[in-house]
């Protein structure tokens, strides 16, 4: 049976269980099961490699001990074991990060995990179906990596916190252009399910890893932080799938939840798509300088990225149009960005890249810390011939970025080979300052075209609605700050 049909069968079985309500809970259920199965596959490999190997969790909780035998415990006995023994034990493991890092990973993964299934017989069917996938086979593991990404894409129900699955084509292009090297620290401060980190890991492995020592070095390079439990568990599983034995650097935390000035870390590479359109809970903004405080998540993350990048550190960040044209605190952040970093390229993405999750129009900002910006190159990414909008069934493809890759040039010579064309143009920093750091600069080589195509009109309408929502959030922030100021004055 193919892996994709195994996944479909899993979903069909879980739909029969009264305790599992909707795609998000199905994904949550599948996540902790997958985590334990993949974790135990790695345990078996580590046992073979090390003579006196010590298990990081009690042996009876390893997948092989209670789940691997298709004729093993089932029904109420299985439910009782999972709910009253397995979960309480793993949530309360004594596993210091320095002495038992793999145990620490398990404890973190299970900190807020939950068994939704109420029928032990159906749970046994799910477990037996999972056992049809052989994670010790590199071919099946690679295949499953692709399927895993598909699961994340299919099951994601985008909420109102602005978290959207980043299309693989966009992720690959960003990592390809940033080109992380062996030994460079690579971070995603809002890592979600780990798409950027997995892509960066694969990029370094495919281009720079030659020896076993290189592979060990690579395992230490990857850093991620995710504040929500389910994406954190999915990301940790994703890292295990990619061969990171001890993904302790994937933290279950809110990156913004400590004063900006207290960050000691200096990171070589940041690739991320921070949540946008959402706002942080009260008090988080107090971790930022008084004149730069806002509750808008994307603005706070951009400040954080500028702060934690090392000298000559490189970043690629997805940001909405609202960041480009926004005023107030957004203007101050863009001024800081151009003073502290060389914002050398902005790739303007077309409508629909994040369909069906949001119609907000987005951009990729590429910058390097240490030198101020002299000029910004813009590249307007066009739809391919015959495409009027992207959709879930017709997503963006990596090959579409070949034109940008061919045009890109080399940062070492200040991109001397770049030339303006119908899609690319540059704007000097003096012009940007004169525009009060409004970076929403239209392509001078493309005239305004009026379209009567219903698909395009619908896409434009969705974009406008999303931008109205973004402006509403900004206005709420400004009014909130003004009211808070008045209270302080009284």
UniProtKB/Swiss-Prot annotation:
Biological processes annotated in GO: DNA restriction-modification system; methylation
Residues annotated for S-adenosyl-L-methionine binding in this entry: 163-168, 193-195, 226
Record keywords: DNA-binding, Methyltransferase, Restriction system, S-adenosyl-L-methionine, Transferase
Coiled-coil residue windows: none
GO MF: DNA binding; N-methyltransferase activity; site-specific DNA-methyltransferase (adenine-specific) activity
Reaction(s) this enzyme catalyzes, per UniProt: a 2'-deoxyadenosine in DNA + S-adenosyl-L-methionine = an N(6)-methyl-2'-deoxyadenosine in DNA + S-adenosyl-L-homocysteine + H(+)
EC number: 2.1.1.72
UniProt xrefs under InterPro entries: D12N6_MeTrfase_N, DNA_Adenine_Mtase, DNA_methylase_A-5, DNA_methylase_N6_adenine_CS, SAM-dependent_MTases_sf, T1MK-like_N_sf
Signal sequence interval, chain numbering: none
Pfam families: HsdM_N, N6_Mtase
Protein role: The subtype gamma methyltransferase (M) subunit of a type I restriction enzyme. The M and S subunits together form a methyltransferase (MTase) that methylates two adenine residues of the sequence 5'-GAGN(7)ATGC-3'. In the presence of the R subunit the complex can also act as an endonuclease, binding to the same target sequence but cutting the DNA some distance from this site. Whether the DNA is cut or modified depends on the methylation state of the target sequence. When the target site is unmodified, the DNA is cut.
Subunit field text: The type I restriction/modification system is composed of three polypeptides R, M and S; the restriction enzyme has stoichiometry R(2)M(2)S(1) while the methyltransferase is M(2)S(1).
Leftover remarks: Type I restriction and modification enzymes are complex, multifunctional systems which require ATP, S-adenosyl methionine and Mg(2+) as cofactors and, in addition to their endonucleolytic and methylase activities, are potent DNA-dependent ATPases.
Family to which the UniProt record says this protein belongs: Belongs to the N(4)/N(6)-methyltransferase family.
Protein name: Type I restriction enzyme EcoEI methylase subunit
Gene from which this protein is expressed: hsdM
């Amino acid at each position: 049976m193919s892996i994709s049909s195994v996944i479909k069968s899993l979903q069909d079985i879980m739909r029969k269980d009264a305790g599992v309500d909707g795609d998000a809970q199905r994904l949550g259920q599948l996540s902790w099961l997958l985590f334990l199965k993949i974790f135990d596959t790695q345990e078996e490999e580590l046992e073979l490699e090390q003579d006196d190997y010590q298990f990081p969790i009690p042996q009876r909780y390893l997948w092989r001990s209670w789940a691997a035998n298709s004729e093993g415990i089932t029904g109420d006995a299985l439910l009782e074991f999972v709910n009253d023994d397995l979960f309480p034990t793993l949530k309360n493991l004594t596993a210091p990060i320095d002495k038992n890092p793999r145990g620490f990973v398990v404890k973190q993964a299970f900190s807020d995990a939950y068994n939704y299934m109420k029928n032990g017989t159906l749970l046994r069917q799910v477990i037996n179906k999972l056992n049809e996938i052989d994670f010790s086979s590199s071919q099946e593991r690679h295949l499953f990596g692709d399927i895993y990404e598909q699961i994340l894409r299919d099951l994601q129900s985008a909420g109102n916190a602005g978290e959207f699955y980043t299309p693989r084509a966009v992720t690959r292009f960003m990592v390809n252009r940033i080109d992380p090297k062996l030994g460079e620290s690579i971070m995603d401060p809002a890592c979600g399910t780990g798409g950027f980190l997995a892509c960066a890991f694969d990029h370094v492995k495919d281009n720079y890893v030659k020896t076993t020592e290189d592979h060990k070095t690579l395992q230490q390079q990857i850093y991620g932080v995710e504040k929500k439990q389910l994406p954190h568990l999915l990301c940790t599983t994703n890292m295990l799938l990619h061969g990171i034995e001890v993904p302790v650097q994937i933290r279950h935390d809110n990156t913004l939840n400590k004063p900006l000035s207290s960050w000691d870390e200096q990171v070589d590479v940041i690739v991320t798509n921070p949540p946008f359109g959402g706002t942080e809970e009260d008090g988080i903004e107090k971790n930022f300088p008084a004149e730069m405080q806002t509750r808008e998540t994307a603005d706070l993350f951009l400040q954080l990225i500028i702060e934690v990048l090392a000298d000559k550190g490189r970043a690629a960040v997805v940001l909405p149009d609202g960041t480009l044209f926004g005023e107030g605190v957004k203007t101050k952040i863009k001024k800081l960005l151009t003073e502290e970093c060389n914002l050398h390229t902005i790739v303007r993405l077309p409508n629909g890249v994040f369909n069906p999750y949001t119609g907000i129009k987005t951009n990729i900002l590429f910058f390097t810390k240490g030198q101020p910006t002299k000029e910004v190159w813009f590249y307007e990414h066009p739809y391919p011939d015959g495409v009027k909008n992207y959709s879930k069934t017709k997503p963006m493809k990596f090959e579409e970025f070949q034109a940008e890759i061919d045009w890109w040039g080399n940062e070492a010579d200040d991109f001397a080979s770049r030339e303006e064309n119908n899609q690319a143009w540059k704007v000097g920093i003096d012009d940007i300052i004169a525009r009060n750091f409004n970076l929403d600069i239209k392509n001078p080589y493309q005239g305004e075209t009026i379209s009567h195509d219903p698909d395009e009109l619908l896409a434009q309408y969705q974009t406008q609605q999303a931008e109205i929502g973004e402006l509403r959030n900004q206005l709420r922030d400004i009014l909130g700050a003004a009211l808070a100021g008045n209270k302080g004055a009284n």
